[in-house]
UniProtKB/Swiss-Prot annotation:
Residues 1-8 are cytoplasmic. Glycosyltransferase that initiates the elongation of O-linked fucose residues attached to EGF-like repeats in the extracellular domain of Notch molecules. Essential mediator of somite segmentation and patterning. Manganese is the most effective. Can also use cobalt with lower efficiency. Has some activity with magnesium and calcium, but not zinc. The lineage of its organism: Eukaryota, Metazoa, Chordata, Craniata, Vertebrata. GO terms for molecular function: metal ion binding; O-fucosylpeptide 3-beta-N-acetylglucosaminyltransferase activity. The active site is at residue 274. Its EC number is 2.4.1.222. This is Beta-1,3-N-acetylglucosaminyltransferase lunatic fringe. It is found in: Golgi apparatus membrane. The gene is LFNG.
Amino acid sequence: MLKSCGRKLLLSLVGSMFTCLLVLMVEPPGRPGLARGEAGGAQRALQSLGAARAAGQGAPGLRSFADYFGRLSRARRELPAAPPSPPRPPAEDITPRDVFIAVKTTKKFHKARLELLLDTWISRNRDMTFIFTDGEDEELKKQARNVINTNCSAAHSRQALSCKMAVEYDKFIESGRKWFCHVDDDNYVNVRTLVKLLSSYPHTQDIYIGKPSLDRPIQATERISENKMHPVHFWFATGGAGFCISRGLALKMSPWASGGHFMSTAEKIRLPDDCTIGYIIESVLGVKLIRSNLFHSHLENLHQVPKTEIHKQVTLSYGMFENKRNSIHMKGAFSVEEDPSRFRSVHCLLYPDTPWCPSNVVY
């Protein structure tokens, strides 16, 4: 009798498992079913289990249940890999000539910083690069094609920085180009990656792209009148990492940015130039910043940028971070003493055909 009860219990258990499998094989409404190949593999495994049960097998039938999952897994593995989805087509075809790169500097850094940029990334992109400084330098004009003396103060003050940004904005509008990109004199710009990024967005739409340096919106006080203040908060892309603005958006900024308006707008919130850009775009115009981790400033730990990903970055930087030297961590033909910024090593990685780059170097 015990043997008969055990047989009934076993058959009941196998029958329940079979029913569960049938339920699993039925595609619920609103959910995608198995791929054709997977469904075929699952069906074959299920048929094997059904055949074993029909043949009156007991314990072997239980092994068939486990075998079903093995067969289903094999069916999944044997399916050809799905082809990678095609890359998103560019919104429009642009060339470096469509981009206006403004490099903000000061006369005391013409040799210490600008010479490095002129030897590296600017050397291949002179027509699209415009250097905004605060003093005359005939030697610099011989090396760079577009040098603009803003006649702004050389001080690193809110007013001086906003003065230069105002000139940058006006010169961009005059240029008729599609994209305005601002960087500092301690940035390396990978122009190929920059152009590829910008081509993903129509320049006629409202595009503001860069990286914030804060983990929350900045809070400021907007001066409405002599005695009335209004709190505002907004995101802004830090100028130290670089940022880009489409022409469509730049034109909308005109009432608050063109002519002398940019400086008066900056005074209204009493914040520096990059914050003022964010204020106009996010707080006044209601356009959101598009964050991109491809922009980098010296305010972040640059050692965390993988060497294998350097060619994908838009901007890099160097400086000090937590009282330590902060630059891209990579090997190259130049020692850290010879190339403390690592910009020369990065440039040779991206452009090994550069005449001064050593050949046969593993980066």
